[in-house]
A protein has these predicted regions:
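Preference for intrinsically disordered or flexible, low-complexity segments
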Residues: 7-205
Length: 205
């Protein structure tokens, strides 16, 4: 437990962002020409997108891109790089008959097929230790915010909030309270787009 409270790492989310900071991040993404992803609003911060001064060639459109995706993409062909535009438009998923999130690894409670389509075909995924899982709340999929441990959850002031979740039993709640970002048990933070509640997923290496 002491280790969890006293050690951090490069994944850390140090504190909640102010509205001004959120606006600056939106402006930076707009300057870079990044599309807006409802279910993954800060893909550069979470590491879903990487940046390269030299650029790489998008496998889908064949154009050089300085921002690219190398995360999970479930398709028959082995895809190395995808640009943000080909993900946002759905072209990458169409061209390769692929998806960025397994549609069997999602919370129940979302009945709108358009929302499912947006999540699995037009939203960059995230990399977990095991099979990535996407949380839902208020009849919609949540926004993915990044990797966290107990230290980050305390800094954000949401530790008690994420523990208030029928998903977790008492033993699992204790594990979350002692989790270390980047450790053997990894937590992934989500936020409801409608009521703002924070939710977790966790897995083991």
């Amino acid at each position: 437990k002491d280790y969890a409270e006293n050690w951090g790492n490069h994944y850390a989310l140090p504190r909640p962002k102010t509205p001004e900071e959120k606006q600056k991040e939106k402006e930076r993404q707009a300057q870079l020409g990044l599309p807006t992803f409802r279910y993954h609003p800060t893909p550069l911060e979470t590491g879903a997108f990487e940046e390269s001064p030299d650029g790489v060639v998008c496998d889908c459109c064949g154009k050089t891109t300085h921002i690219f995706y190398t995360g999970p993409f479930y398709a028959v062909e082995d895809i190395e790089y995808l640009c943000p535009e080909c993900i946002s438009s759905g072209e990458a998923a169409r061209k390769y008959d692929g998806c960025f999130q397994d549609d069997c690894s999602l919370d129940n409670g979302v009945d709108d097929p358009e929302k499912l389509d947006e999540l699995i075909h037009r939203t960059p995924g995230y990399s977990g230790w095991q099979q990535e899982y996407w949380r839902a709340h208020c009849g919609d999929y949540c926004a993915y915010l990044g990797h966290v441990g107990a230290r980050e959850l305390r800094a954000l002031g949401v530790l008690e909030e994420v523990l208030d979740d029928p998903m977790w039993d008492d033993e699992q709640k204790k594990m979350i309270q002692e989790s270390v970002n980047g450790g053997h048990l990894q937590c992934y933070l989500f936020q409801c787009l409608h009521c703002g509640k924070h939710l977790l997923w966790m897995d083991f290496d």
